[in-house]
From Swiss-Prot:
The modification D-tryptophan is found at W58. The modification 4-hydroxyproline is found at P57. It is found in: Secreted. Residues 24-54 form a propeptide. Keywords: Amidation, D-amino acid, Disulfide bond, Hydroxylation, Ion channel impairing toxin, Neurotoxin, Secreted, Signal, Toxin. GO terms for molecular function: ion channel inhibitor activity; toxin activity. This is Contryphan-Li1. The cysteine framework is C-C.
Length: 63
């Protein structure tokens, strides 16, 4: 009975090690990627970038 218990424990350890090595095959490669913020100012910043492409609301003083 002790040999059977040891065999079951060894099989469980090997199986868990195999699962850890293989990992999740169905997950995309970029699951940890952070989406890039193209408009850090939000909607207002996007509108201002269209209206004033230089990004400066005071055109004469922006050099």
């Amino acid at each position: 009975m002790e040999k059977l218990t040891m065999l079951v424990l060894v099989a469980a350890v090997l199986l868990s090690a195999q699962v850890m090595v293989q990992g999740d095959g169905d997950q995309p490669a970029d699951r940890d990627a952070v989406p890039r913020d193209d408009n850090p100012g939000g909607t207002i910043g996007k509108i201002m970038n269209v209206l004033l492409p230089s990004g400066c609301p005071w055109n004469p003083w922006c050099g």
